[in-house]
A protein has these predicted regions:
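Active-site-adjacent "subsite" loops/lids of carbohydrate-active enzymes
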Residues: 3-18, 25, 33-90, 99, ...
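Aromatic-lined carbohydrate-recognition surfaces of secreted/lumenal glycan-active proteins
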Residues: 32-43, 96-100, 132-153, 177-222, ...
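Substrate-binding cleft/loops of secretory-pathway carbohydrate-active enzymes
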Residues: 46, 50-53, 104-106, 200-250, ...
Length: 387
């Protein structure tokens, strides 16, 4: 691969120390296993990886995307080489790998970005799959133009916005074929990682992180990368089920973009009702638009955990990612959020009731208050005492 890890900054925290090696023995003494979480890098990784810009996806207009291409051989080489080296060098028990990224369709619909990926490697794979690449590119452009015009208020939609959207897909079925190709490519990367690590140590546990977008509000992810298709390349699945922060995230990342685009003919309350209906939540149990900032109920955690458990069908464990004290606001989060202790207890209980084999206290340890951790511990002990 052309990608190279840069030597760490000698002034950085823990520089020159083998952190995984140092953690192994203390973890063993406490009866704990040591897992690594590999986060899908974005364009920002160019600060740490030489050559990373060469593997970024390319949109329909030839512009670089901010995430790497699934099919680029140098990206796959970097990913597999890095993971092999880590598991051959350190006494790691498992990996949680997860790519937090929208699909090509949702990148356009929710993010206003170009339709991806049309690098030489994706084009070659598309041709091998029998897809007309030029038609896929043209359809992607038409879709982008429609969403842009809707956002600007210049679109002409005499038959209605949704009919106009469906007309694009009917005229260019290659767009959906390209979306399918993207999902297949991503699942293939997960399988390559799984096989590579099992070849090193069969007892290594390989898991898939399903981020908040994928688990909770992205219909294209729900249709294209389904839980029932994951157990052939994972030992466990960790769906993100952050109940309280989902309210603000839903408003910012789902309702507002659609209000400017494909669902602009609906009011915000109507769009929210449609979301609840599409994603299997009770309108009576969940908040209206005016209370959405307070988050969703523990029942949401039950619903999404149960969906993952039923999809895995006993072929992979499900560890529900419970959100604790996750800041709200744009980006990574800037506004401090203290989770309600009673709700924390309830969501842990709901996750296990739905069939989860375990939970993951999420998102970041340094964000979580001692009070929240104590409630989680009490809830887990209470659940296991009744089993």
């Amino acid at each position: 691969t052309s990608i190279r890890h840069r030597p760490p900054d000698p002034q950085a925290m823990y520089a020159g120390r083998e952190v995984f090696a140092e953690l192994a023995e203390p973890a063993r003494k406490r009866g704990m296993k040591l897992y690594v979480r590999h986060y899908q890098p974005s364009q920002e990784a160019t600060r740490y990886l030489d050559g990373f810009e060469s593997v970024l996806a390319v949109d329909h207009a030839g512009r670089p995307h901010n995430k790497p291409c699934w099919n680029h051989p140098d990206y796959r080489g970097y990913l597999l080489g890095t993971m092999r080296d880590m598991f051959e060098t350190y006494p790691l028990d498992g990996l949680q790998y997860g790519a937090e990224r929208p699909t090509p369709m949702t990148d356009v619909i929710f993010g206003g970005k170009g339709f991806i990926c049309f690098c030489e490697h994706c084009q070659a794979r598309g041709k091998r799959s029998g897809i007309n690449v030029d038609r896929a590119r043209e359809g992607g452009k038409v879709l982008c133009d429609l969403v842009t015009a809707l956002t600007k208020g210049t679109a002409r939609t005499p038959d209605g916005v949704m009919a106009e959207f469906l007309a694009v897909l009917l005229k260019y079925p290659e767009v959906l074929a390209w979306e399918r190709l993207w999902h297949d490519s991503g699942n293939e990367v997960h399988k390559l990682l799984y096989d590579a690590l099992k070849a090193i140590r069969p007892q290594v546990e390989v898991g898939r992180h399903v981020d908040h977008r994928q688990s909770s509000w992205d219909l294209f992810y729900r249709a294209g990368s389904r839980y029932q298709d994951m157990p052939d390349h994972v030992d466990f699945i960790k769906p993100i089920v952050y109940h309280d922060i989902l309210g603000p995230r839903l408003q910012q990342n789902y309702l507002e973009p659609l209000q400017q685009g494909l669902l602009k003919e609906l009011t915000l309350p109507q769009s929210l009702d449609l979301f609840y209906a599409w994603f299997g939540h009770s309108r009576d149990a969940e908040p209206g638009v005016e209370l959405l900032a307070e988050g969703l109920s523990p029942q949401y955690v039950y619903n999404e955990t149960k969906r993952a458990v039923e999809g895995a069908a006993g072929r992979a464990a499900v560890y529900a990612g419970i959100g604790l004290d996750i800041p709200s606001g744009s980006g990574w989060g800037t506004d401090v959020w203290q989770s309600d202790p009673e709700e924390v207890y309830a969501v842990v209980e709901k996750a296990f009731t739905a069939g989860a084999a375990g939970i993951v206290a999420s998102r970041e340890y340094e964000e979580i208050t001692t009070a929240s951790l104590q409630v989680v511990g009490r809830a887990v002990r209470d659940v296991w005492e009744t089993r």
